[in-house]
Design a protein with these regions (language model features):
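N-terminal charged helix/coil linker that caps or initiates catalytic domains
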Residues: 1-29
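Glycine-rich adenosine-cofactor-binding loop
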Residues: 28-46
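Conserved S-adenosyl-L-methionine
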Residues: 48-52
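Glycine-rich phosphate-binding loop and adjoining beta1-alpha1-beta2 segment
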Residues: 57-92
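Conserved SAM/SAH-binding loop
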Residues: 103-109
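Short amphipathic alpha-helix with an adjacent loop that forms part of the alpha/beta core around
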Residues: 109-117
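E1/E1-like adenylate-forming module used to activate ubiquitin-like modifiers
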Residues: 120-149
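Single conserved hydrophobic/aromatic residue that forms the stacking wall/gate
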Residues: 146, 153-157
Length: 157
């Protein structure tokens, strides 16, 4: 672990214990959809010391995103959301490996998209309900940690 990493995230050991903090540091989490929910989820994970993130989204930052998406600013207008988020994370957590996939997730293509990541956990923040239900069913069957912050409880398994 680098000295910078230790100074930035070492305090988590006092909060979660050595083993608990190490589980957070070693986690590989994929966030599907880097918009109003997903950008904040990715931010929280990176600021919590997670050292490997996967970000999946096809959209680009627009002015209408600025009021609710943490990576959206005048400087990032027109950038892909995944690149804007990766750039933001690199500014405060350079030890975080951020893998990006510039794809739209739907009910048919998500298994192939997630297969390349092999995550420990998936946060579903995509907009498409059919994709959400398909991913939730798969996660339950695979015993994979999965959450979908949504108004309907499709969520945790």
């Amino acid at each position: 672990m680098s000295a910078d990493f230790e100074r930035r995230f070492g305090g988590l050991r006092r909060l979660f214990g050595v083993a608990g903090a190490q589980r957070i540091f070693d986690a590989h989490v994929v966030v599907v959809g880097i918009g109003g929910v997903g950008s904040w989820a990715a931010e929280a994970l990176a600021r919590s010391g997670v050292r490997r993130l996967g970000l999946i989204d096809l959209d680009h930052v627009s002015e209408s995103n600025i009021n609710r998406q943490i990576h959206a600013s005048t400087a990032t207008l027109g950038m892909s959301k995944i690149d804007a988020m990766r750039q933001r994370i690199a500014g405060y957590h350079p030890d975080c490996q951020v893998d990006v996939l510039d794809e739209f997730v739907d009910a048919e293509n998500w298994p192939a998209l997630l297969q390349g990541f092999r995550p420990d956990a998936v946060i579903d923040a995509c907009d498409q309900i059919r994709a959400k239900t398909a991913m939730a069913a798969w996660a339950r069957q695979s015993c994979l940690l999965y959450t979908s912050p949504s108004p309907r409880d499709l969520s945790t398994s």
